[in-house]
């Protein structure tokens, strides 16, 4: 099957996908489209949970989220986010992040299906970290090459219902065992495209060290974070891409190169999404650059 792609780059659209006839979509074809464009919108698909799962398995190896409280009641591979009480976990993703950056195997792809969207201006912000890196002068790139960055997700881990009334120290120790700080190369090379990617995150990256474990001047990290646009409170950075979507669309992106955060709109109402996260069998997150 040849998928119909409209546009190119972030937000390119794939049209005409029939959720009841996915057998003709090949893994190589859909992956190549994502690797090339980084963020694609499959328009008006409206799949059932089972069809959404089938498409996810075509894209890659589905990895369920490590915390069961996010799981769909019938399909634990599906991560459910919802502002409707009892339908999922609310207020997810309201900060810049890369999915599973804090785990030993960060995902290759993330795929989201909106089921309810409160208004036309609700969406997601994305930053292409390869484009950011390419924009930096050599003098700013040099201190980051060959270094390792430490990423600590713990202050963004949500308290579970089962944690209520437990001692905070006990909860903190459990979080630290499940998601301890982890180190990745500050600059990675994409295993498929070869692009170099500035692999840092304002809400999780705490320090940069050289190959011998010596702390790099914190100003280097601060300047790199500022260059990405993550610190821009108005979201006016030229590196920030705003993506809107509609119920029934599927948003699929390359999780190695794109970081994202939720864009809250002006309308009240319920937001409910399903998410799948996949590996592609290649080096994750990437090779040291």
UniProtKB/Swiss-Prot annotation:
Its EC number is 1.14.11.78. Disruption phenotype: Deletion of the gene cluster mmaABCDE causes a significant decrease in the intracellular accumulation of zinc in Sauton's medium where metal concentrations are relatively low. It comes from the Bacteria. The keyword Iron applies. Gene3D superfamilies: Clavaminate synthase-like (3.60.130.10). Its cofactor is Fe(2+). One of its GO terms (molecular function) is metal ion binding. This is (3R)-3-[(carboxymethyl)amino]fatty acid oxygenase/decarboxylase. It comes from Mycobacterium marinum (strain ATCC BAA-535 / M).
């Amino acid at each position: 099957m040849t998928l119909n792609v409209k546009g190119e780059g972030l937000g390119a659209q794939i049209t005409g996908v029939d959720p009841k006839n996915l057998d003709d979509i090949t893994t190589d074809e859909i992956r190549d489209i994502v690797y090339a464009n980084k963020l694609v919108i499959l328009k008006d698909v409206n799949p059932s949970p089972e069809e959404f799962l089938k498409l996810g398995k075509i894209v890659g190896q589905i990895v369920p989220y490590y915390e069961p409280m996010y799981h769909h009641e019938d399909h634990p591979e599906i991560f459910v986010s919802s502002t409707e009480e009892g339908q999922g976990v609310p207020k997810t993703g309201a900060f810049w992040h890369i999915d599973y950056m804090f785990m030993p195997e960060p995902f290759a792809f993330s795929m989201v299906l909106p089921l309810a969207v409160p208004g036309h201006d609700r969406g997601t912000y994305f930053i292409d970290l390869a484009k950011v890196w390419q924009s930096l002068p050599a003098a700013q790139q040099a201190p980051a090459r060959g270094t390792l960055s430490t990423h600590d997700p713990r202050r963004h881990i949500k308290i579970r219902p089962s944690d209520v009334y437990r001692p905070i120290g006990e909860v903190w120790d459990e979080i630290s065992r499940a998601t301890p700080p982890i180190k990745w190369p500050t600059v990675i090379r994409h295993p498929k495209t070869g692009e170099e990617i500035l692999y840092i995150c304002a809400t999780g990256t705490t320090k940069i060290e050289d190959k011998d474990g010596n702390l790099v001047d914190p100003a280097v990290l601060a300047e790199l974070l500022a260059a990405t646009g993550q610190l821009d409170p108005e979201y006016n950075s030229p590196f920030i891409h705003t993506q809107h979507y509609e119920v029934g669309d599927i948003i699929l992106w390359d999780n190695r190169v794109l970081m994202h955060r939720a864009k809250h709109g002006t309308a009240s109402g319920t937001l409910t999404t399903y998410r799948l996260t996949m590996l592609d069998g290649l080096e994750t997150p990437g090779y040291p650059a």
